[in-house]
A protein has these predicted regions:
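Short loop segments at secondary-structure junctions
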Residues: 10-11, 34-36, 45, 109-113, ...
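Active-site-adjacent beta-strand/loop module that shapes the phosphate/pyrophosphate-binding cleft
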Residues: 6-11, 95-114, 127
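Nudix hydrolase/Nudix homology domain
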Residues: 52, 97-99, 113, 121-163
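Acidic, metal-coordinating catalytic segment for phosphate/diphosphate chemistry
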Residues: 1-29, 34-35
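Conserved Nudix-box catalytic region and its N-terminal flanking loop in Nudix hydrolases
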Residues: 20, 29-73, 77, 90
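A short coil-to-beta-strand element that immediately follows conserved catalytic motifs
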Residues: 82-89
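Helix N-cap/coil-helix junction residues
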Residues: 80-81, 143
Length: 163
């Protein structure tokens, strides 16, 4: 939905802006650490680039679902794991100059096997990637999504601090 904002700034200047208003409650992207040295990635089809992309599990929040519960649900649907330890470590916007959408970065630890049915059209490949090889990962042609790249470095740096 396109929303119009008529604003007056502190200097008296008036402007009209248009922005894309998010339809939902936002989204989560999950940095799931099976141990202190690895992170879980999924390989899934991305229709925008008409190809497969390596990235972190992610998805939209459902109605009446808090961020941590939504992250745990997405983790189970996409990776076949749930987490006993979940916490929000940041918030990312895609284009704050014209979109209201935000993605919340969730760190997931203390993982255990648990699968929920998801909405993906095919089973996703789950890859354990070493945190000390992130530079190699983001130089690949199949790991280009900005939210994933930002969340990977946030999780790696936080994991280093907590050792």
């Amino acid at each position: 939905k396109i929303e119009q904002l008529d604003l007056e700034f502190s200097n008296g200047e008036r402007r009209t802006y248009e922005r894309l208003k998010s339809r939902g409650l936002g989204a989560v992207i999950i940095a799931a650490l099976p141990d202190d040295d690895h992170i879980l990635l999924v390989r899934e089809y991305a229709c925008g680039i008409h190809g497969y992309e390596l990235g972190l599990p992610k998805g939209r929040l459902e109605a009446d679902e808090d961020r941590l519960a939504g992250a745990n649900r997405e983790l189970q649907e996409e990776c076949g794991f749930a987490a006993r330890d979940l916490r929000e470590i940041g918030r990312l916007t895609l284009a704050p100059g014209y979109m209201t959408h935000a993605t919340h970065v969730i760190l997931a630890r203390d993982l255990y096997p648990s699968r929920l049915p998801g909405d993906e059209p095919e089973t996703l490949d789950v890859i354990r990637w070493p945190l000390d090889r992130l530079t190699e990962l983001v130089q690949r042609e199949d790991c280009t999504e900005g939210r994933t790249i930002a969340a990977l470095y946030m999780a790696r740096d936080l994991a280093k601090l907590q050792r």
